[in-house]
């Protein structure tokens, strides 16, 4: 993030995807690019940290299970390098993350894998709008699990 002539935060990319599965990373990237977002992807936590330092993304989508670092460690380091980056952690197992952990690391929310692309895009666009306006990620919600619905069945 840098400051423009009026002192407003500017970002070099919209979304950084941190996902070690190239197929999943490409699927997410293609879907988000259709919403006209600038998207970069990395395959490890250490590469993500290097990329954040260079690009200052508005939003980071972080897989919890990476080959070198876990998603919480990556989020902690991103928060130190780029406090304006909003973060979403994705995992096949959400029971590992407590609200306390999320609050302490600045993770906005977490999503269960496989990720539903529509709700993910909505969350990303909301975070980008808020981050672009203020230069900071939005306040952390009290409830971090995004609601899911399947037909008439709904989880909130």
Where are the regions a protein language model picked out?
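Acidic catalytic/metal-coordinating carboxylates
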Residues: 44, 70-73
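Active-site residues of response regulator receiver
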Residues: 63, 91
């Amino acid at each position: 993030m840098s400051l423009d002539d009026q002192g407003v935060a500017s970002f070099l990319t919209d979304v950084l995807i941190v996902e070690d599965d190239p197929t999943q990373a490409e699927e997410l990237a293609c879907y988000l690019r259709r919403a006209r977002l600038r998207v970069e992807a990395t395959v490890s936590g250490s590469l993500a940290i290097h990329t954040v330092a260079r690009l200052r993304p508005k939003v980071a989508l972080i897989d919890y299970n990476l080959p070198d670092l876990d998603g919480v460690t990556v989020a902690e380091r991103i928060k130190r390098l780029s406090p304006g980056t909003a973060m979403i952690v994705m995992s096949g197992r959400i029971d590992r993350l407590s609200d306390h952990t999320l609050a302490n690391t600045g993770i906005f929310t977490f999503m269960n894998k496989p990720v539903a692309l529509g709700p993910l895009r909505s969350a990303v666009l909301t975070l980008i709008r808020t981050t672009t306006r203020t230069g900071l990620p939005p306040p952390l919600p009290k409830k971090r699990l995004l609601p899911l619905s399947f037909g008439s069945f709904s989880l909130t």
